[in-house]
Structure formats: C-alpha cells, structure tokens
C-alpha cells in the first residue's frame, strides 16, 4: 500500500515511512536533500531562490529602518525590535513571504499546499528564549506548519544569531493537558514561559546542544513546527541582524493556538489566518468539513459570560454539534 494513503494526516517529511517515500516523492536530488535534513534534524538550510535578492533585501532594510529607534535600543533596550506583518505595507516583504518557488518547495515537502500567514522582520537579534512554534501556531492534523528564516544581511557571531536544537522536533508536542494547565483558569493564553522549564529539562535529558546559524545574506533556514529554536544573546549592539521570518500553514487543516486552548473543555482558540499570497481569510476545516467558528466558539471571548458547565456537558455538546 502507498505510505501516503496510510497516513495522509502526517506531513511527508515527518512520516515514519520517510525512507519508502523519499525517492518517489522527491525525485530531484536537492529537494530530497532538504527533505532528509528536515526529517532527521528538523531544519534545512537553503539559498533563497530569488534572482534579485540583494536588491529586495536592501529595499526592506531601507523601508523598515525608519520604524525602529535602533540607537535608543543600543543605549537602553532589552530584548529585541520587531515589526509584525510588514507585508501589508511593503511589497518586498510580501514577495519573499509568498515566493512561488518557496510555496512549491514547501508543498512538495509536506504533501499539502503551503501558504504564508505571518511575517516578522527584525533589525537586531531576537534574544528570544528557546521555544517551539507549535505552542503558538498549531494545526489539526498536527505539524502542518513551518517557518522560513531569511538573512537580509551577513550575520555576525556577536549579533545574536538564530539558535536551534537539531532533533528536538521529534519530541512529542506537549500542550496544556500534559503540563496540568487549564487555559480557562487564566482567562487566555499564558505565554510560552510556562513551557520553558520543560524545554530546558528536555534539552538536558536528551543531551542536545544549541547550534547557531551563521548565515550569509540570501541564505534561509526552514524549521519544522516542533523544532526548539530561539535567539542567542546579542553580545555587540553595534551590529545589526536584519532578518525576516515567515510562518506557513497548509491546506485542509484547522489552525489554533494551543497555549490558549482546552479542547476537551470546549475551548479552542481558533486562528483565522489571512493567506498573504491572496489576501483572503482562510477557513478552518476538519476532514473536508468547514468549521463554523461561531458554533464552536472562540476560547475565552465568550467564557466570561457563559454559565459554568461540567466537563461532560462541554464534551457532550461538542459531540452533537454539526461541523459541516
């Protein structure tokens, strides 16, 4: 039997049948190399496939520079500087995010059509603690999400380079239920800080060491949904670290925020993402059925005014709702 038919709800690069799939799914040697890296390590490095990349990178840096007070950050700032969804104002950001060759590549790697839903642009290092995107952006079926980090300039070792933990993507996707948490008790998402002690202990348990991506301008790193990654400390604030991250979802899924969800309690913090390539809001689906968000309910937006219900009543209500 075709392995694709056995597990259609698992990304091809995450499939336990990867070795049987590889040659047929990716006849191109370079694409097969990228797939193998993602399967083994949870990330893959590529040269961004854009002929005019240098000019586009310069345009992004020039247009976004005025939005940041980098001098003040150098004197007083902690953490990082960022702008989210600059694709709405700047075509160059949108062009990189929705690049047809990237979309085709990701679609071939995952086995479903990819589309971009969020961009983040940084002039300096993020200095962000190690985390997985899966607690922020998840899907059902799980793992149909990835990120593409792009170097908009050569990255210096003291500029707070991207860090990642190879192989961490193979860990289970831990959520509120495994941590003994109920988001409803907190009135919404709790923040990734509640997960960070677990991630630190898992790193020690598995003996993993952080690797740094000393990228040159035009290189990109694809990471899978559950890869542990973050930003190293920026040791020299004289350096910039211009970069762009685009987050991607895939067709035929439901998309939600696990940190703010208690699915078995009837609370799912669904996302209503916009496809950057088309500008259209994408609808959540489950096994081909569109999920009506007004029926399922957005977590916490109605919780404050909703009468308290038992766990059984919540689950029973969900079981008898129509999702088509």
Identify what each model region corresponds to.
Residues 18-19, 158-228:
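Double-stranded beta-helix
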Residues 133-145, 208-209, 215, 239-241:
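A short beta-loop-beta micro-motif enriched in histidine and acidic residues
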Residues 124, 165-173, 247-253:
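Short edge-strand/loop segments of extracellular domains
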Residues 121, 132-134, 150-154, 166:
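Short, structured patches in soluble enzyme cores that scaffold and shape functional sites
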Residues 1-132, 136-141:
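Non-heme Fe(II)-dependent double-stranded beta-helix
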Residues 112, 124-127, 155-157, 220, ...:
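Short, charged/polar surface micro-motifs in flexible loops or helix N-caps
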Residues 2-16, 20-24, 70, 178-180, ...:
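Non-heme Fe(II)/2-oxoglutarate
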Residues 140-157, 214-217, 222, 247-251:
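Short, conserved beta-strand element in jelly-roll/cupin
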């Amino acid at each position: 039997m075709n392995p694709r038919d056995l597990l259609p709800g698992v990304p091809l690069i995450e499939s336990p049948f990867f070795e049987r799939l590889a040659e047929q799914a990716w006849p191109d040697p370079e694409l097969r190399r990228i797939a193998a890296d993602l399967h083994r390590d949870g990330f893959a490095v590529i040269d961004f496939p854009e002929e005019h990349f240098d000019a586009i990178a310069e345009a992004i840096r020039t247009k976004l520079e005025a939005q940041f007070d980098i001098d003040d950050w150098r004197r007083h700032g902690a953490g990082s500087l960022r702008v989210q969804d600059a694709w709405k104002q700047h075509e160059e950001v949108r062009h990189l995010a929705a690049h047809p060759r990237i979309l085709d590549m990701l679609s071939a790697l995952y086995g479903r059509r990819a589309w971009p839903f969020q961009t983040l642009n940084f002039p300096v290092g993020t200095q962000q603690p190690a985390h997985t995107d899966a607690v922020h952006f998840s899907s059902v079926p799980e793992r149909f999400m990835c990120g593409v980090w792009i170097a908009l300039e050569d990255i210096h070792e003291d500029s707070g380079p991207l860090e990642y933990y190879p192989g961490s993507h193979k860990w289970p996707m831990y959520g509120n239920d495994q941590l003994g948490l109920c988001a409803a008790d907190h009135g919404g998402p709790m923040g990734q800080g509640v997960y960070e002690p677990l991630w630190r202990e898992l790193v020690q348990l598995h003996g993993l060491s952080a690797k740094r991506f000393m990228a040159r301008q035009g290189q990109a790193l694809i990471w899978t949904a559950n890869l542990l990654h973050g930003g190293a400390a920026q040791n020299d604030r004289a350096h910039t670290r211009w970069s762009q991250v685009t987050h991607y979802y895939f067709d035929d899924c439901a998309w939600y925020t696990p940190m703010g969800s208690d699915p078995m309690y009837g609370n799912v913090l669904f996302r209503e993402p916009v496809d950057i390539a088309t500008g259209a809001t994408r609808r959540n689906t489950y096994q081909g059925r569109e999920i009506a968000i007004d029926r399922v309910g957005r977590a916490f937006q109605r919780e404050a005014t909703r009468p308290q219900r038992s766990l059984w009543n919540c689950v029973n209500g969900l079981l008898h709702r129509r999702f088509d």
